[in-house]
């Protein structure tokens, strides 16, 4: 039910806030969180079709996040801001810190549901 979604969302942000704060690479990303993989795959196909038809990727991704994502970040078009490894769940981190920048990645399944991820920037570790 909705209590479970609320608890999972709170856990996600608590994990983010108190995760590793070490120096390291930083990524900036947006995501769409939905309950199941089939829904995520359908939304990814919709995004890719619209972009192939000339729609700007970031704007389309943000619209899909606002309309379909169950994460509170939906209000900001799915934007998660900048974060370091260890601030997100490991399945999410693995994709964000290795996947292509500027492409729709996923679906990535975590304990929260199925994510589509758009990495908008990544900086290597500061020396």
What is the predicted function of each stretch?
Residues 49-91:
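Peptidyl-prolyl cis-trans isomerase
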Residues 29-33, 41-53, 79-82, 103:
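Second-shell loop/turn segments in exported
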Residues 40, 44, 61-62, 93:
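A general structural signal for well-ordered alpha-helical packing
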Residues 45, 77-78, 109, 126:
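A generic "cationic amphipathic patch" detector
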Residues 2-37, 91-126:
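Proteostasis/folding factors centered on peptidyl-prolyl cis-trans isomerases
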């Amino acid at each position: 039910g909705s209590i479970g979604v609320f608890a999972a969302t709170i856990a996600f942000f608590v994990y983010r806030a108190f995760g590793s704060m070490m120096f390291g690479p930083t990524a900036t990303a947006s995501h769409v969180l939905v309950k199941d993989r089939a829904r995520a795959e359908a939304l990814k196909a919709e995004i890719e079709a619209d972009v192939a038809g000339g729609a700007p990727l970031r704007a389309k991704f943000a619209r899909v996040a606002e309309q379909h994502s169950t994460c509170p970040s939906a209000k900001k078009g799915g934007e998660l801001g900048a974060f370091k490894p260890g601030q997100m769940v490991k399945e999410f981190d693995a994709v964000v810190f290795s996947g292509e920048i500027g492409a729709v990645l996923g679906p990535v399944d975590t304990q929260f549901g199925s994510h589509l991820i758009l990495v908008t920037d990544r900086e290597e570790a500061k020396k």
